[in-house]
């Protein structure tokens, strides 16, 4: 468990990562990423039951996170890297041809920590509901978290 000062320090690192990634790629959506930094930092470092060392794509025995607003990948990738899912140095490859870190999260590139591809706004919440129902049916008492965007709100 991290205290508030540690969470603030991680959030500051994540915000720096976001700016570096978007500026280096000359592409991306920094606004949503910057505004959701504290949410994802708190989830991954103080709320969610997750461990990069034991992570599995099926989500059994762990909390799951779905980023419905898929264009906010800079914050998602930075938090995943800072939580230990892949090296922080890989953030430099954001949106480069052939890289795992593209503009929307994808499960095809084998990036650990991502349970659901997203991109079409409005699909993440329904996917998260389905994953939560699956957890309930299989008696997995872990949680599914979803960061919704304007697609679910309109």
What kind of region is each of these model predictions?
Residues 30:
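Histidine-centered catalytic micro-motifs
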Residues 1-14:
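N-terminal hydrophobic or amphipathic helices/low-complexity stretches enriched
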Residues 18-21, 33-154:
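Cofactor-binding active-site loop characterized by glycine-rich and histidine/acidic residues
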Residues 11-27:
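N-terminal capping segment at the start of a domain
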